[in-house]
Design a protein with these regions (language model features):
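Short, hydrophobic beta-strand segments
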Residues: 75-81, 171-192
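Substrate-binding clefts and catalytic carboxylate motifs of secreted carbohydrate-active enzymes
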Residues: 1-124, 136-137
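Short beta-strand elements
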Residues: 98-106, 206-219
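Extended low-complexity, serine/threonine- and proline-enriched intrinsically disordered segments
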Residues: 51-60, 145-160
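Short, solvent-exposed loop/turn segments enriched in Ser/Thr/Gly
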Residues: 123-129, 195
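Short aromatic-acidic-glycine turn motif
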Residues: 65-67, 109-112, 150-167, 219
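Short glycine/proline/serine/threonine-rich loop/turn segments at secondary-structure transition edges
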Residues: 192-198
């Protein structure tokens, strides 16, 4: 970690103060989940333009902090991990914004989603399909990885797959890959033939429901 605990105040502080001002084009890894070993000391960062933010764990306040107190403009708390709900409540000009993270279970399924439910059958239009590992309650699982495969039927051109990791070296021209933060991306291109492209995903005992993308001739 780039942080250590200030024993006098119990707050996280940088191991090398001011290093963030000198580091170019790099950033430390961050996780968008609340799943860690019990009592693991975790640095919680909150990115916000609110004047102050209160952090709560399972309804208990862990203190309110002010943006002006953080030179790098990132709120920070040192929190021993306890399963449950982590909530940040920000206040700005009397208005409140809230963001929560919950402890999730083991992956039990795959959820597929896309913004492009219909695309033109012009041989150029593209559809992006995101596969996300989810637990039994449908919560995104972002702390575990699985290898998943996409199954497709219809007229399409496979442009590739990716998981968003900057160090990903898996085969782009494939219908399977290992997730990163529980996610993977499938990119398809239409042909000039109208079609219904039916997509599902499976892997390591997990499966998804089917989704359909319609390619159509434009009028």
């Amino acid at each position: 970690s780039i942080y250590k605990i200030d024993e006098a105040r119990g707050n996280p502080v940088e191991r090398n103060p001011g290093a963030w001002e000198k580091a170019l084009w790099v950033w430390h890894d961050v996780n968008e989940h609340w799943n860690y070993p019990d009592d693991c000391m975790t640095i919680v960062e909150v990115y916000s333009n609110c004047e102050e933010v209160e952090l709560l764990l399972n309804g208990q306040s862990l203190g309110t902090k002010h943006l002006a107190d953080f030179e790098d403009r990132i709120y920070k708390w040192a929190v021993p991990f306890t399963a449950g709900t982590l909530e940040a409540r920000g206040t700005k000009a009397g208005k409140q914004a809230t963001l929560k993270r919950i402890t999730v279970g083991e992956p039990t399924g795959i959820q597929l989603s896309t913004y492009e439910e219909t695309v033109a059958a012009d041989g150029k239009s593209v559809a992006h399909i995101v596969a996300q590992l989810v637990d039994e309650n449908g919560n995104p699982v972002k702390n575990q990885e699985r290898e998943i495969s996409f199954n497709l039927r219809g007229d399409y051109r496979l442009l590739g797959v990716d998981n968003g990791a900057p160090d990903n070296v898996q085969d782009l021209q494939s219908n399977s890959l290992i997730t990163d933060q529980g996610r993977s991306l499938l990119i398809l291109q239409s042909t000039e033939e109208p079609s219904s492209i039916i997509i599902s995903a499976q892997g390591e005992g997990l499966s998804s429901e089917e989704i359909t993308i319609i390619t159509h001739q434009e009028l």
